[in-house]
């Protein structure tokens, strides 16, 4: 059986990525459902934290938002390449750095899933101090 040659570290690493991916999907599904129930209004507001569903069609913080599908596909391809690079980096590191990279991979896979199936990434956590978001 091929799996008997895989190391304990592989199983731990895979489990971390799968857990973060699962939590990412679960939290987004939950917030999307809350948004539907609230008819699109703010889900939660406080002094420093708001939960508001926004569909991000760009990259980080909504940068480079656009409607051209070929540009969107190029960004998705770049994200896939970055995920591969992060996996390779995690294999070459140990301890906290390795696990941090694996958690980033899990979240990035969740975002890639959203880009493929929804053409946007649902963002909902808004930390702020006063008017600075």
Each language-model region and where it sits:
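Alpha-helical transmembrane bundles and membrane-interface segments of multipass inner-membrane proteins
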Residues: 1-133
